[in-house]
């Protein structure tokens, strides 16, 4: 996320196990010990706020299974697994709230799909190829030990936020 939005300054995360009992491959029920949903809010340097929600129990009524929503003062973006939609500040509808009549605004209308400029390969494959080239040919590799440590730190602080039900500030690693 640092490479797209900037450094993460804070996080609130709530995880949940919405389906406590599952059925295994043999048709036998078992108690689930894994969370099946994560709801997170991130604050980035510069004031950008992003909401990442992921759930295996969602009945999808959005563009994709995973949706990342990022708001800024000049516009917003909604990103799925394949597509990105943006809405500039100037295209944002200005509704008047009136619960007595149907809403006349189609809020999806003012969004613009970001055009695909190139074909993308499988992301996991591409990262492995970059890593193997780094190991064999000593080519640059942007995801070093510090980047890994920042990822572990964010995951641990996300779990702490969930456990304490509170906003957590992210300290800088050195």
Predicted regions and their residues:
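Conserved metal-binding segment of the jelly-roll/cupin
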Residues: 51-55
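C-terminal glycine/acidic-rich active-site capping loop/insertion
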Residues: 10, 15, 20-31, 39-46, ...
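Short, small/polar residue-rich loop motifs at catalytic or cofactor-binding pockets
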Residues: 36
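Short amphipathic alpha-helical/adjacent loop interface patches that line ligand
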Residues: 128, 152-155
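Short arginine-rich
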Residues: 154-164
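Solvent-exposed polar/charged
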Residues: 2-6
